[in-house]
């Protein structure tokens, strides 16, 4: 089993870069959507809620397939070579699917953290004459720090979800596993892949715990 590890490690860079890029895009989107939900912006609130329902209510694999194969159903897109090339790129399609999926769950996580802030803190800011936007600027960082423990699960989940990218020909860890299995028909290839995922997930969890510990250091000092 361990003799397969060097070959499988060739796909680890793709898995990690896809994870990091997806998390960055998802964080930016989740921040925007969380602010919209908190400010209760008309129309936009319903659009965000519809988006969350769509991406949390359907399987990630279906989303990947629709984003990768869907544009092929619109022949007019082929009239724009640059756009067609981008939409035919497996890495970009996987990035879009993972980002949109993760952003939906992260928005729920962050919005839940904001709603968990004691009412007294909102009232204190209001008593100081602060607008809701100014209040958010103060309370949002606190809410995000409080949600780090749960967000670490999302980080691990995104990395594990990159294993689905092989279904659209992206050669990450699982892609190389399928390639090796096709050559050897040795099921232990997947055992070796499991070891890689287990080790990386353990390191990601440890990293998030350290970040959480540092971010919440002020609570221990108090």
UniProtKB/Swiss-Prot annotation:
Pfam families the UniProt entry points to: BPD_transp_1 (PF00528)
Entry keywords, A to Z: Amino-acid transport, Cell inner membrane, Cell membrane, Membrane, Transmembrane, Transmembrane helix, Transport
Coiled-coil ranges per UniProt: none
UniProt keyword annotation of Transmembrane helix present: yes
PROSITE patterns referenced in this protein's UniProt entry, alphabetically: ABC_TM1 (PS50928)
Source organism superkingdom: Bacteria
Cytoplasmic compartment residues: 37-49, 101-154, 208-222
SUPFAM superfamilies named among the record's database cross-references: MetI-like (SSF161098)
GO MF assignments: transmembrane transporter activity
Database matches in InterPro entries: AA_ABC_transptr_permease_3TM, ArtM/GltK/GlnP/TcyL/YhdX-like, MetI-like, MetI-like_sf
Gene Ontology biological-process entries: amino acid transport; L-arginine import across plasma membrane
Cross-referenced CDD domains: TM_PBP2
ABC transmembrane type-1 domain segment(s): 12-208
Compartmental location: Cell inner membrane
Periplasmic topological domain residue ranges: 1-15, 71-79, 176-186
Subunit structure, as described in the record: The complex is composed of two ATP-binding proteins (ArtP), two transmembrane proteins (ArtM and ArtQ) and two solute-binding proteins (ArtJ and ArtI).
Protein name as catalogued: Arginine ABC transporter permease protein ArtM
This protein's encoding gene: artM
């Amino acid at each position: 089993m361990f003799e397969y590890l060097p070959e499988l490690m060739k796909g680890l860079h793709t898995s990690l870069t896809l994870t990091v890029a997806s998390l960055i895009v998802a964080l930016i989107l989740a921040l925007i959507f969380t602010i919209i939900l908190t400010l209760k912006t008309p129309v936009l609130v319903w659009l965000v809620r519809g988006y969350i329902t769509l991406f949390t209510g359907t399987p990630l694999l279906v989303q990947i397939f629709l984003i990768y194969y869907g544009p092929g159903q619109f022949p007019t897109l082929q009239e724009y070579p640059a756009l067609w090339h981008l939409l035919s790129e497996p890495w970009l399609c996987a990035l879009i699917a993972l980002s949109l999926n993760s952003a939906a769950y992260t928005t729920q996580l962050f919005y839940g953290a904001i709603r968990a802030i004691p009412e007294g803190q909102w009232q204190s800011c209001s008593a100081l004459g602060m607008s809701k936007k100014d209040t958010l600027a103060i309370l949002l960082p606190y809410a995000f720090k409080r949600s780090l423990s749960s967000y670490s699960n999302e980080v691990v989940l995104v990395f594990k979800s990159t294993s689905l990218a092989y279904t659209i020909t992206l050669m990450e860890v699982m892609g190389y596993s399928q390639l090796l299995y096709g050559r050897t028909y040795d099921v232990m290839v997947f055992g070796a892949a499991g070891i890689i995922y287990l080790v990386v997930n353990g390191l990601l969890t440890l990293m998030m715990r350290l970040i959480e510990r540092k971010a919440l250091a002020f609570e221990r000092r108090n």
